Amino acid sequence: MADLQERGHLLTEQVNPLSQNLDQLSSLELVELFNSEDLKTVEAVAAAKVQIATAIEQTADRLRQGGRLFYVGAGTSGRLGVLDAAECPPTFCTPPELVQGIIAGGAGALVRSSEDLEDRAEDGDAAIAQRHITQLDVVVGITAGGTTPFVQGAINSARQRGALTIFIACVPAEQVSFTADIDIRLLTGPEILAGSTRLKAGTVTKLTLNILSTGVMVKLGKVYGNRMVDVAVTNQKLRDRALRILQDLTGLSREAAGFLLERSSKWVKLALVMHWTGLDKDAGDRLLSAHQGNLREAVASYKNQND
């Protein structure tokens, strides 16, 4: 573990030479500087694309076997993990326990700074034990500077339980080395405001989690083409989206699409199976279940057997 008392050598703590006159910039100059620095976040994701792709494949494999995905972090990193986890149920109709966020300090830390709680590795260990992590699960540790004891404690505990571990940090391994199954380094350089990792480090983390969770859900068959066919229809906006998906993919009128959606218990994926195969709700559900919810595979299998 790195020396927690001295972090000045860390990339995320260094002073950015391009922003040394930050307090003297005009508002327009400040925006231009932020815009140019933020371009580095996209470059950092590109540089880590192989590791991110590996994380997608291996995470999807664990979840197919009944595993769960956990994000672990403190401060901004923890909040981003909780945010990404919270978006999965409405977007992909996943149960809330499938993707979970663990933040040092618990729910209260989402709205009130609790950074002092990140220094306890034993709390990270306890968080993993409390959730009964097994070899089927995936634990993603997120720590911009790479040294957060809460995250390191959680990852070490998860490794001991046989879980797939993924480490995400914004410092090079030469500065902070850590043992995990997949090591993702997102190097965006010093922050415009020195040490404020809610900036580029936060942005690049959000980009990466977007790709990771969406990629996993694509691999799990939660998407057809680029449509969220497992969207949870829980309000008027999402009902409208569901109807437009059905209209676009079937050519039905809005009224007919609405009727089909109701017949399928508001499940777009099942509605499409029913429309494309002529099966009733129960038979369509069984067909999807036989193909682990993969719409494309289910429909192709039915057509191959009935041509």
Swiss-Prot record:
Job description of the protein: Specifically catalyzes the cleavage of the D-lactyl ether substituent of MurNAc 6-phosphate, producing GlcNAc 6-phosphate and D-lactate.
Extra information: A lyase-type mechanism (elimination/hydration) is suggested for the cleavage of the lactyl ether bond of MurNAc 6-phosphate, with the formation of an alpha,beta-unsaturated aldehyde intermediate with (E)-stereochemistry, followed by the syn addition of water to give product.
Organism: Nostoc sp. (strain PCC 7120 / SAG 25.82 / UTEX 2576)
Annotated GO MF terms: carbohydrate derivative binding; carbon-oxygen lyase activity; ether hydrolase activity
Domain SIS: 59-222
Annotated metabolic or biological route of this protein: Amino-sugar metabolism; N-acetylmuramate degradation
InterPro entries to which the protein is assigned, alphabetical: Etherase_MurQ, Glucokinase_regulatory_CS, MURQ/GCKR, SIS_dom, SIS_dom_sf
Name of the featured protein: N-acetylmuramic acid 6-phosphate etherase
Keyword Lyase: yes
GO-annotated biological processes: amino sugar catabolic process; N-acetylmuramic acid catabolic process; peptidoglycan turnover
Catalytic reaction(s) noted: N-acetyl-D-muramate 6-phosphate + H2O = N-acetyl-D-glucosamine 6-phosphate + (R)-lactate
CDD domains associated with the record: SIS_Etherase
Oligomeric form and interacting partners: Homodimer.
Domain of life according to the entry: Bacteria
